[in-house]
A protein has these predicted regions:
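Short Cys/His-rich Zn2+-coordinating modules
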Residues: 171-179
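Short edge beta-strand segments in beta-sheet-rich domains
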Residues: 41-44, 141, 189
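Short helix-capping/linker segments at secondary-structure and domain boundaries
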Residues: 2-3, 134-140, 202-205
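Metal-dependent nuclease catalytic cores that hydrolyze phosphodiester bonds in DNA/RNA
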Residues: 1-99, 206, 211
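Exposed alpha-helical structural elements
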Residues: 10-11, 166, 190
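Mg2+/Mn2+-dependent nuclease catalytic core
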Residues: 74-172
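Cysteine-cluster motifs in flexible loop/terminal segments that predominantly coordinate metals
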Residues: 1, 179-211
Length: 211
């Protein structure tokens, strides 16, 4: 069954993707929200009666979001939004939320930020985008951003070589799986609660006969 679209999350993400000016930020965000109330039901499977309450709720938060983002706008703008990146050489591709100044990859997250730093999954995603951007521009991208608009936070993080290497190892594991070879399970794998446990164990058993 398809997962139901969360109108509030789509609205907040679309608001940040539409961010384009530094002046009169609160007015700018309110104007974007009014436009999105009309446009989002045309783009996504969202009914107007779903998006309207989300817009009213967001309008009540915009003043706080604008105050919080005001000190971060130089990190975010000017920018390109929803940038498609692909590398045949690296075997990686993705759609980056925001290409911020200095060719820094930036992710938009509608959930809560961790107490410190960023979530591990986002660190790996930034490392992957850094690899793609680095190859495209023939340079090392050493910093990325994660935006948490609900909390009006923008966190800058260093992208380390260990993160890049981990992305490439994950890529290699995915290639193995696509080729019908399952990589070894780590000792701490959480198999007991996994929905795919029976299928996975069967495939591991079959694979062990040949590899």
């Amino acid at each position: 069954m398809p997962k139901k679209i969360d109108a509030g999350q789509i609205l907040l993400r679309s608001l940040m993707l539409s961010l384009s000016q530094k002046n009169d930020l609160e007015i700018h965000l309110k104007d974007i929200t009014a436009r999105l109330e009309v446009e989002l039901p045309l783009i996504y499977e969202i009914e107007p009666e779903e998006i309207s309450p989300a817009c009213r709720e967001l309008e009540g938060e915009i003043a706080g979001i604008a105050r919080g983002l005001a000190g971060h706008l130089d990190l975010l703008l000017p920018c390109q939004a929803e940038v498609d990146l692909y590398s045949d050489k690296l075997g990686l591709s993705g759609r980056l939320d925001r290409l911020a100044p200095g060719n820094r990859p930036s992710l938009i997250r509608t959930g809560k930020a961790p107490q410190d730093g960023i979530w591990k999954r986002d660190r790996l995603m930034l490392a992957g985008y850094a690899l793609l951007l680095g190859e495209k521009h023939r340079t090392h991208i050493n910093q990325g951003l994660v935006e948490y608009p609900r909390q009006a936070l923008v966190r800058a993080v260093q992208i380390h070589s260990v993160d890049r290497a981990r992305v490439l190892r994950i890529r290699d594991r995915i290639r193995q799986i696509k080729d019908g070879r399952l990589p070894d399970r780590p000792d701490d794998a959480s198999c007991q609660a996994c929905e795919a446990r029976e299928i996975c164990e069967t495939r591991h058993s079959l694979a062990s006969r040949f590899f």
